[in-house]
Amino acid sequence: MNDAALAPDVSAALERGLQAQSLDAAFAAPLLRYLALLVRWNKTYNLTAVRDPREMVTRHLLDSLAMQPYIASGALADLGTGPGLPGIPLAITRPQLQVTLVESNGKKARFMREALRHLELGNARVAESRAEALAEPAAYDHLTARALDTLAGIIAVGGHLLRPGGSLLAMKGVYPHEEIAALPAGWTVGEVHPLQVPGLEGERHLVVVRKG
């Protein structure tokens, strides 16, 4: 399947979303190629519970891209990335960002390798590993973990990967007062950004946590 096999309204929804997020319309083509590949592999390998490509545009692509204004360059580790979310959309739209996609599930890691090859995405790589087992201490400027755990839980498994002064960018729903209060010593909240995701109802926040 290529992007041409996706219904026209899928492409239109993505283009509207990119415009709402002030992103170049040229990113639609590689994002649709990634989406088409995900739809095809998902039928066999069950990479995501979301099946409808229209819903994938909102819940996977546009939701992932909501954080991109707050991360421009440097090295990013995306922990428990699944099929590459948010790491692959971020790598597409932020070519100066070096993205490591950390995922222990073999079929998801295989999918991501194929996606990177298919997209010729040279600024991303796959690390087939659990985050806590990845032996790359202080190698990253940024961490993100869209689908993992509490803030303290993310720090427990992946905090060693972040350099001093680096930032954890955590996507959350409602403002996570309790999680912020439970941060371990040496970690502080820098900013909390309310996010608007085109087509997605409900609260979304990006919590930026700094490593002391």
From Swiss-Prot:
Keywords: Cytoplasm, Methyltransferase, rRNA processing, S-adenosyl-L-methionine, Transferase
Locations listed in the record: Cytoplasm
Major location (coarse): cytoplasm
Domain of life, source organism: Bacteria
Family label: Belongs to the methyltransferase superfamily. RNA methyltransferase RsmG family.
GO molecular function per UniProt: rRNA (guanine-N7-)-methyltransferase activity
EC id: 2.1.1.170
Function: Specifically methylates the N7 position of guanine in position 527 of 16S rRNA.
Catalysed transformations (reactions): guanosine(527) in 16S rRNA + S-adenosyl-L-methionine = N(7)-methylguanosine(527) in 16S rRNA + S-adenosyl-L-homocysteine
Name of this protein: Ribosomal RNA small subunit methyltransferase G
Cited InterPro entries: rRNA_ssu_MeTfrase_G (IPR003682), SAM-dependent_MTases_sf (IPR029063)
GO cellular component terms listed in the entry, alphabetical order: cytosol
UniProt: S-adenosyl-L-methionine binding residues: 80, 85, 131-132, 146
Pfam families: GidB (PF02527)
Enzyme class: transferase
